[in-house]
Amino acid sequence: MELLAVLAVPLSSAHYIRSHFPRKRGQLPLRQFPPQPMTITFIQYIIVCPLVFLAGFVDAIAGGGGLISLPAYMLAGLPVHKAIGTNKLSSAMGATLTTARFAKSGFIELRFAIPCSAAALLGSAIGARIALLIPEHVFKIIMLFVLPLVAAYVMSKKSLKDRSELEPFPFTKAIIIAVLCALFIGMYDGFYGPGTGTFLLLLLTGAARMPLNDSAGITKVINLSSNIAALAVYIFSGNVLYPLGLAAGVFSIAGNYLGTRVFTAKGSRGVKPIMITVLGIFFIKLRYELFFAK
């Protein structure tokens, strides 16, 4: 009887687990525990906030601020997925104000904006889900190769004037191309992000042959939509550090505001050396973590 009593405990426990947590054949067990909270230090604020301010400043002048803001979080020691998720929070804050400003100026055409926004929401959510499936060390290797290519392309981009002078497509053809661009670039933004605004502007003016002002407005709408969709995915996966992201968002808005005023007065001179310096520091740290740190 004593032996039966001892055996009954694990057997009854196993029955309880099977009855309350059924699992299909071939399905891996799901994690039942949420991610552990991460403590944010004062030093991390000191590293992230000024660099995100700088990213907003650069983005307003020449674009490509994401090439600085995402590395900023990783330089502060955040894991890759938390860095991307928290960066989406601060980016969404800045994108909201920028989009509102473009809408107020009349640069957002709703018949393009609404379908492109829907496509960006879908694409970004898919991209973010894919990103969460990739282990951190693999993601760092991807960044080691992708980020310099994106940086080189963004910093060497040519003037958009020639593209904007192309003969416009009929509305139906233009909107189909624009929606496809929003879907695939939205997927890239959810997965990774840096350079999204530049890619969109080049594709909308070149591939969809939209006027430059309309392309700029639709780019802001797509960027905001993809940020919101990716942010939602990262929030539900527990990969957003709210205090750091909100503080960085305020600095990003301030940097964007100052950058707009400086660009009006002096243009984009001096931006490339800033971006090269920040990216150089980030690559040194990334290579050390991948190849030398134990």
Where are these regions (language model features)?
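Residue-level signature of the transmembrane alpha-helical core
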Residues: 49, 53, 57, 88, ...
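Hydrophobic alpha-helical transmembrane segments in multi-pass integral membrane proteins
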Residues: 184-191, 230, 283-294
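Membrane-interface alpha-helices at helix entry/exit sites of multi-pass transporters
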Residues: 80-86, 111, 210-220
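Extreme N-terminal basic, low-complexity initiation segments
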Residues: 2-9
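Transmembrane helix exit motif
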Residues: 97-107, 144-170, 261, 281-294
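Selective hydrophobic functional segments
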Residues: 85-138, 142-145, 227-277
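Selected transmembrane alpha-helices and immediately adjacent juxtamembrane segments
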Residues: 37-79, 166-216
